[in-house]
Amino acid sequence: MQEQYRPEDIESNVQLHWQEKQTFKVTEDASKEKYYCLSMLPYPSGRLHMGHVRNYTIGDVISRYQRMLGKNVLQPIGWDAFGLPAEGAAVKNNTAPAPWTYDNIEYMKNQLKLLGFGYDWDREIATCDPDYYRWEQWFFTKLYEKGLVYKKTSAVNWCPHDLTVLANEQVIDGCCWRCDTKVERKEIPQWFIKITDYADQLLNDLDTLESWPEQVKTMQRNWIGRSEGVDITFDVAGSDEKLTVYTTRPDTFMGATYVAVAAGHPLAQQGAVNNPALAEFIEECRNTKVAEAEMATMEKKGMPTGLFAIHPLSGEQVPVWVANFVLMEYGTGAVMAVPAHDQRDWEFATKYGLPIKPVVLALDGSQPDVQAEAMTEKGTLFNSGEFDGLDHQDGFNAIADKLVAKGVGQRKVNYRLRDWGVSRQRYWGAPIPMVTLEDGTVMPTPEDQLPVILPEDVVMDGITSPIKADPEWAKTTVNGQPALRETDTFDTFMESSWYYARYTCPQYDKGMLDPAAANYWLPVDQYVGGIEHAIMHLMYFRFFHKLLRDAGLVDSDEPAKRLLCQGMVLADAFYYSGNSGERVWVSPADAIVERDDKGRIIKATDPQGRELVYAGMSKMSKSKNNGIDPQVMVEKYGADTVRLFMMFASPAEMTLEWQESGVEGANRFLKRVWKLSYEHLEKGAVQPLNVATLTEDQKALRRDLHKTIAKVTDDIGRRQTFNTAIAAVMELMNKLARAPQESEQDRALLQEALLAVVRMLYPFTPHVCFSLWQALGGEGDVDTAAWPQADEQAMVEDSKLVVVQVNGKVRAKITVAADATEEQVRARAAEEHLVAKYLDGVTVRKVIYVPGKLLNLVVG
């Protein structure tokens, strides 16, 4: 064993060993308990960032720990390879998306290997591989045959720059999240999958996910948004038109004073026929932002249509307005407004001088003051005719029943969740396997023509998808008839919704999944990924699993038992103001900083001497130029140090602040472990440990060792508080370094401790532990070693240290037998000179005893 810890000498050799021995390759083995650990697959952007490193280190720690417990552990990796960034990069670099993507995969694969992640590389997949997406296409055709897929014209957010549809969440301040172009509304035909058919299952099964973060489950519940209410139909005055609204508060119905409709509603169009101002407003609404997160904060605007709806119970006429906060794709595209009891309706009514009629009493039974704001609490009805005096639930039922009886109402369960639009007008994605015959018949691509392969040798002009620009590509024949292929491609969430299942059988060519392999490995035991995926990816992931189950391909109801959402990685951010006042962000690596005595940054300059503004810690990003290249850190400190810092600096689910001083601290710790091991081995062979002959000090040290094993086992396995596990090993190492090494049993105890420390650190720092295990004479490779077991006997304390107080002041510390009674402790305390002198001539009025810890004698 060399004297100095030099990761550059160790890590590449250990990685080569793993590669040659195929250490992490697994197959199904019914004789062993399986464990499937999965981190969300990366997009091959070209370089790993620290967010990747954190995600994959967490997954690797869990995988290695579970393997040491004797389980058959699957930890695969692959590439979420389709997507818009590849098209932009291809245009910029004058290439095609495919070679750019494959080059990035190769580069990032090598980066992952440098970090020592224990993947089964034989299971690697890239979602742009036709052997992968052929089964996605096949499954889509089966969903179509089951009636779960349909095509309809839909209003979408359209980015005129990227020429693609954007999800509501991708519209920021009315602009495209990627290129900042103003977004337009456009009607185009799109393919949808009926996720709404599974809304109740998706909602109810959240209760079975006991090991998922509550935050994620709450976000999904809100996204599904199940509500019970009533569809109410209004007649339109002077017309045969009908107007239907959905409400969850029929108890407030007698307070409805206007109806608001979406810009795309037929009544809006009708009102605009002879009203140019309304037509202009409708056009403005069509092109306005519709991201739901911004709905609550944006300015509420409206315009009257000139039409009136007739209240079906009171017979009163209420005006119909077009409002920018009503969306055609949600519910019926119309809402009844009760401004006295809904804040949004109140703001709109106040702005435009519409009536506000309270119909629910305040909680104290008084009439509510609705001049300053709406009264939104539920309560007793008044001002509601025959329904006066009813409480919320009775009012809800009575008004709903009356509407149903009159034929103008229908009780209904509604969902916020909308069907999944899977069409994208981009090139770099899996072609949607549908064709249109000459007679207009639309049908799935026949199975024997799958996969519909995306041509990869293309020229990108940055404007039109190559498969849309080339009329020849779309031409095909089905049953001898000419047909045209669909030129839209799948939303890339399609690929990432089932990749976890394909990992169980990536080479299987007889079907989408090998049921035997899939049902051996699934569900995933541990999934690791960011909280930002809570409602999109993780919802589709769960939905797809239920589709696979209903197709007979998997047996389980849910795809993953346990979910860990790691926090973001933050770094210092610096900028200076450019010539036009814009912020020019400077990499932290180039910032020369001065700190105060508490380590806070007080001044920063760039290499040219420009003064920099310190913008604090923020998420590592290209936009703020504050990403830290993992490769640079690995080359400087070694992969084990980077991994250890990532797991120690913060609890896994919290944000992590990147501090190079912390990385240096992790490196120093590994050097200490190496140094202690080296010094121990330099003293020669070690005798077997004889537990029966240990001194009290040796027993105490061994007790600390086995308590640490118990704590680290619980911290990694159950609590997943990896940082506290590492802290416990560090604390133990401090004790080991201070322990005497004079006798044979001192050295035998240190040998036991070091072999345990190496195994406890192995999931975090596998390379150095591999080397130390060999040097210390561990059996076989540490990769196949068993996790250390805490010795219950060793943890039993023969004695306890009890603090003795008199009137609350510490007077002595005494050692007593671990099972000593209170009387024995009091007797022992009375023997102490420092205690006895305070008891002389006084009466003990009260005794406070905390067993094994504290004795407080209150005297007077």
UniProtKB/Swiss-Prot annotation:
InterPro entries tied to this protein: aa-tRNA-synth_I_CS, aa-tRNA-synth_Ia, Leu-tRNA-ligase, Leu_tRNA-synth_edit, M/V/L/I-tRNA-synth_anticd-bd, Methionyl/Leucyl_tRNA_Synth, Rossmann-like_a/b/a_fold, tRNAsynth_Ia_anticodon-bd
GO MF term list: aminoacyl-tRNA deacylase activity; ATP binding; leucine-tRNA ligase activity
Keyword line: Aminoacyl-tRNA synthetase, ATP-binding, Cytoplasm, Ligase, Nucleotide-binding, Protein biosynthesis
Nucleotide-binding as UniProt keyword: yes
Keyword Ligase found: yes
'HIGH' region (motif): residue ranges: 42-52
Superkingdom classification of source: Bacteria
Regions that span the bilayer: none
Compartment annotation: Cytoplasm
One GO BP: leucyl-tRNA aminoacylation
Main enzyme class: ligase
Residues holding ATP: 622
Principal subcellular localization: cytoplasm
EC number(s) recorded for this UniProt protein: 6.1.1.4
SUPFAM superfamilies: Anticodon-binding domain of a subclass of class I aminoacyl-tRNA synthetases, Nucleotidylyl transferase, ValRS/IleRS/LeuRS editing domain
UniProt short sequence motif 'KMSKS' region, positions renumbered to this chain: 619-623
GO cellular component, one term: cytosol
Catalytic reactions on record: tRNA(Leu) + L-leucine + ATP = L-leucyl-tRNA(Leu) + AMP + diphosphate
Family: Belongs to the class-I aminoacyl-tRNA synthetase family.
HAMAP family cross-referenced by the UniProt entry: Leu_tRNA_synth_B
Record's protein name: Leucine--tRNA ligase
Lineage, uppermost ranks: Bacteria, Pseudomonadati, Pseudomonadota, Gammaproteobacteria, Enterobacterales
